[in-house]
Design a protein with these regions (language model features):
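S-adenosylmethionine-dependent methyltransferases
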Residues: 1-286
Length: 286
């Protein structure tokens, strides 16, 4: 198992605590999703299936049309996506976690990374809750190696991977510098510990946006940070100060982090325009 700085028994105990306080839900187990040589050798989509977008200053990305993806997934009878669409919902706990949508704070995080010139070249990066993958793609284009993680396998296969392929000129880099995962965060900790056993395989940067909305999942999020971040690494969490209707928010998440006494926190960016939004930086306490 990966050496996290605490024993396997303690890691299991942490996850057991999470499960005991959550509403009982059937979370999808974590899996690693491989990109085949066939996917890399053929055209990933038709020209009408994607658009070019200016997302972060002068950074222009090609993105699959989400409407087309939804239609395709409905035709394939992907029941979780069908249920979400029938309810006109971006979120159905343990079934669909909004990965087909580019959320507002992802733009904030991307612009912050560029504007503050956060070093990305030769860094190992986790785009956690990646959805369309725009933050991870930005890191890739700046020389990082990136692991993309989102809850729904359908999102990774139908949106994240095609978006990565569309934006990387040398497709061999997709296999050399990328990995893709889906499933629940507690399960992801266990899976990644089985696949990557050395401290140097932890991440220099963990980037995550709009993932603190559900208080029941925040301990899982925190556990990923403390187990998978290098000792001199940084986490950047972009989110709203308060998520109406679901109860999470920046202050509430920051309180959890401070109670755990593992990370220092610093608000490195904020906006009062519209709904209040912030970017929180976490580093290990010394």
């Amino acid at each position: 198992m990966f050496k996290f700085g605490f024993s396997d028994d303690n890691a299991k105990e942490e996850n057991d605590k999470i499960e005991s306080i959550e509403t009982v839900l059937d979370w999808f187990p974590a899996v690693k999703i491989e990109v085949s040589h066939e996917q890399l050798s053929k055209k990933c989509c038709e020209d009408d299936d994607f658009k070019e977008c200016d997302l972060f200053y002068d950074v222009r990305l090609k993105l699959i049309h989400s409407d087309k993806v939804v239609i395709d997934l409905q035709q394939e009878n992907c029941e979780n996506i069908v249920e979400a669409e029938s309810q006109h919902s971006d979120l159905i706990p343990a079934k669909y976690e909004g990965g087909l949508k580019v959320w507002e704070c992802s733009y904030d995080l991307g612009k912050y990374l560029i504007g503050d010139k956060i070093p990305l070249e030769n860094k190992s990066v986790l785009d956690l809750g990646c959805g369309t993958g725009i933050i991870g793609i930005l890191a890739l284009l700046n020389g990082a190696s990136v692991h993309f993680q989102d809850y729904n396998t359908e999102v990774i296969k139908s949106v994240t991977i095609p978006n990565v392929i569309l934006n990387i000129n040398d497709r061999k880099h997709v296999q050399e510098r990328c990995a893709f995962f889906s499933g629940d965060w507690a399960s992801f900790i266990q899976l990644r510990g089985e696949l990557y056993r050395n401290d140097y395989e932890k991440y220099d940067l963990i980037l995550t946006s709009e993932t603190i909305y559900n208080p029941d999942n925040q301990k899982k999020l925190h556990n990923i940070f403390k187990t998978h971040l290098k000792k001199n690494g940084s986490v950047y969490v972009a989110g709203k100060v308060y998520y109406f209707g679901v109860g999470g928010g920046m202050r509430q998440f920051e309180d959890l982090v401070q109670k755990e006494k593992i990370f220092e926190t610093k608000t490195v960016w904020n906006s009062d325009e519209g709904v209040q939004r912030e970017i929180l930086k976490l580093t290990f306490r010394t």
